[in-house]
Amino acid sequence: MCEIDLSNYHEPKPRRALQILWRVINATLFKMLVGSPLRDMRNLLLRAFGAKICWGSIVYPSCKIWAPWLLEIGKNSCVGPHVQLYNKAQITLGDNVVVSQGSFLCTASHDISDPRHSLVVAPILLDDGVWVAADSFIGMGVH
C-alpha cells in the first residue's frame, strides 16, 4: 500500500473573496428566486458574477455552481434541478443543450502520479443540441 503525505499540499485559490461571496449568494438569494418568472433574475445574478448566458436559457435555482465567471451557456439551454457545475476550468454549453436533474459536471481532478496530488483542470464543452441524461457525471476535458 502506498503511503501518501499531503502535509505539503497547496492549492492556489485565485479570486478567493469573490468565491466566498458567490457561495453565500448561491446558497441563499439564488435559491430563493424560484419559478419561471424569476429565471431572468437568476441569470442576471450569474451575469453579475461573470457568467455569459444567452437570453432564453434556464438555470434552476437548486443548481450549485462553483465559479460563474467560468461558465458560458448558449441560447435556449437548460441546466436542470440539482445540477452541480464544479467548474475550476471553463464549462461551455452550446445552444439547445439540456443538462438534466442531478447531473455533475466536474472540470477538476488530482494528479495521482504526483506525490503532492496537485490539482489538474481541463474545460468541458458540450456542443449544440447535447442532452445529458439525469444523474450523469461529465468529467474534465469532455468535448
Predicted regions, residues:
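Residues at secondary-structure transition points
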Residues: 36, 48, 68, 88, ...
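Left-handed beta-helix
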Residues: 55, 60-61, 66-67, 74-75, ...
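Histidine-centered active-site/metal-ligand motif
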Residues: 110
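A short acidic, helix-capping loop that chelates divalent metal ions and anchors anionic groups
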Residues: 113-115
